[in-house]
Amino acid sequence: SENHQEVGDKANDSLRINGKQLRCKVIGEGGNLGFTQLARIEYAMSGGVSLTDFIDNSAGVDCSDHEVNIKILLNTLRKKKQLSEKNRSSLLHSMTEDVSELVLANNYRQVQTIALANYEMEFRNKEYAGLMSYLGQRAGLIRDLEFLPSVEQLEERAVKQQYLTRPEISTVTSYMKMYLKQVLINADYIDDGYLEKYLHDAFPASLAKRYRTEISKHPLRRELVATQLANFVVNLVGPSFIYRMVESTGASVSDVVKAAVMAKDIFDIEKYWLQIEALDYKVAADTQAVMMTRLTRLLRRSTRWLLRHQENVMGFAEAQSTFAREIKAIRKMFPQKLPPDFQEMFVEKFEGLVADGVPEELARDITRCEFLFSATSFIDISQTCGEKL
């Protein structure tokens, strides 16, 4: 709890209320500092849905970042006399909607990962307790300063079936992204040509297509790729993923990210993730969450397998050529090639998704992911023995 003096905004003392007094179900903060962090947490603990001002307003900062990165590129083109001032201005104006789409996509994914983390929190309470200690040691996270609960307080909440709230998850998510970016800038693979797609995805598609070579030479190339990779990992697999992989495998942070990129691509995770997102407001959010957690489970398992079996020897392109085509072939074998009891399990999961309104093709693909985690082992054994699958 806190009093008016601790809030430090005397002009609004007569207007201020407590978070638990709000009767609305959802809060979105259009401005900064409308809530204190403790008020957000109190509101969330009372059943409300809220994030933080820096999450709700992240689009503003993101838009500025895109603008700066684009202007650096265009100024470089101007100096080389590849672009006139007039064309530069018109080009900037023409990209307004494209930049908006990029910004909103980032904002959407960030809120999505916080929601998914909240969805799974009952089963990951101890994991997040460890994560906060990990970030405290490596990323400068101070629990008291950020109003985050101690291990003991988390245990007390769990007894009451209360867990880390979305405002608290928002803080942890931000610290993990900042930490990852710092680590990845110095990763030995950050300049690998395979990762250029992450660099180009930071720019409007029309600009990336027109100035592909010039973007590849962007002065902030490493920073941009590191930022994109940090966003990919945290947004897709959650803020606790890196900590969990490091603790369970002993691998370095940069190696975990490398393996995660490989796993995402060889299993074509992004393709199915986008199809799930396309079902917004067409199926229940819980149904989408179930499908997304099935994909992230596959991604976690395959990342762990790559870390334990490849020992960082394999490159991005090699992983793609070694596994991707074979995994597609194995995927098509399911459920026919599964043992009878697994076939029954497959049908049950598949029919459950269809009953919840998921299109049959997507329901089948997502259900196949439940049984694909051994695919990399099958392929490895096949290639070692020189036998076809």
Predicted regions and their residues:
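Ligand/cofactor-recognition surfaces for anionic moieties
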Residues: 2-389
